[in-house]
A protein has these predicted regions:
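Glycine- and other small-residue-rich loops at beta-strand/loop junctions that grip anionic moieties
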Residues: 8, 34, 135-136, 161-162, ...
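Glycine/small-residue-rich loop that forms an oxyanion/phosphate-binding "nest" at active or ligand-binding sites
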Residues: 80-110
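Structured adenosyl-cofactor binding patch, chiefly the S-adenosyl-L-methionine
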Residues: 106-109, 149-153, 167, 171-178, ...
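Active-site/ligand-binding-proximal alpha/beta "capping" segment
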Residues: 206-255
Length: 277
């Protein structure tokens, strides 16, 4: 079997400049590639399930950049051997140049950017609870945290509508701890999505500071879709009007709202509490 590992020793190597450039959205768009940094994140990417009733995003890794000097564990080589693609080995100083992290662990995978629009034709069934819709999210770290929380709370599907950010921004991947690859996450049209779920018997709840109903007052054992809006502007009028009810979280201080990711977490874990009663 030919040796797939190539050694890079110069900062000026074109491959170094190319992979470092994928930190920028314009380069990701042009190359139709994005990078996945970290052992945990890459591990989840290569084990993502695209054959479930609601498939996860497909991940096709095309190259791997490694620096054994930065490895933090004992399983890195096994992971490297499981990925069938060209491998580029770099010294620590060069790897740190391309890394997105303060303390890199020596692993960056480059993957093809998948089509992230909802694949309605590939969804075998929609019978999961709850479902989460995020409208107009602006901060990559917030979206990543929401995905991590949603996966932990047993959410069956996340749809991002009218996103202000790139779904494959390195901060989204990092803050999600790789759950962007193990949880079905897609981009969709708000009206189409809400109409689709209404036809499937879902209750649609818009969570907003001025919501009429306290979030703990509804029956979350029923098939539920929860809508959350952007950090700055909240939910659009369309989102509120197309929902069956509007929910609010109690605010006892001077602040008028909570962080978007925290609000999602509170509602989703109330859903767990009710479903487990």
């Amino acid at each position: 079997m030919p040796n797939r590992r190539q050694y890079i020793t110069s900062f000026s190597n074109p491959k170094v400049k190319w992979v470092a450039g994928l930190k920028e959205k314009r380069n990701r768009d042009e190359e139709k590639k994005f990078f996945i940094e970290g052992y945990r994140e890459i591990k989840k990417a290569i084990t993502s399930n695209s054959n479930s009733p609601i498939p996860c995003l497909p991940v096709n890794i095309t190259s791997l950049f490694i620096s054994p000097e930065c490895f933090l564990g004992e399983n890195e080589e096994a992971l490297i051997n499981s990925v069938k693609c060209p491998i580029f080995e770099l010294p620590r100083k060069i790897f740190e140049k391309i890394s997105y992290r303060d303390r890199p662990d020596g692993l960056i995978a480059v993957a093809e950017t998948p089509d992230a629009h909802v694949p309605w034709d590939k969804i075998k069934s929609i019978d999961t609870n709850p479902i989460l819709i995020i409208e107009g999210v602006e901060k990559p770290g917030n979206l990543g945290t929401i995905l991590r929380t949603a996966e932990g709370a047993g959410v069956g599907l996340v749809i991002v509508t009218d996103p202000r950010i790139d779904l494959f921004n390195p901060n989204v991947v990092r803050a999600s701890t790789g759950t962007i690859f193990t949880l079905p996450v897609y981009i969709g049209d708000l009206k189409e999505v809400l109409t689709k779920f209404q036809s499937k018997g879902y209750k649609r709840y818009a969570v907003t500071p001025e919501g009429k109903t306290l979030y703990t007052s509804i029956n979350m054992k029923e098939k539920s879709v929860f809508l959350f809006g952007s950090e700055q502007y909240g939910l659009s009028d369309d989102a509120k009007q197309l929902s069956d009810d509007t929910l609010h979280l109690p605010m006892l201080g001077e602040a008028d709202s909570l962080n978007l990711a925290m609000s999602c977490g509170i509602v989703l874990y109330e859903s767990i509490r009710q479903r487990n009663k």
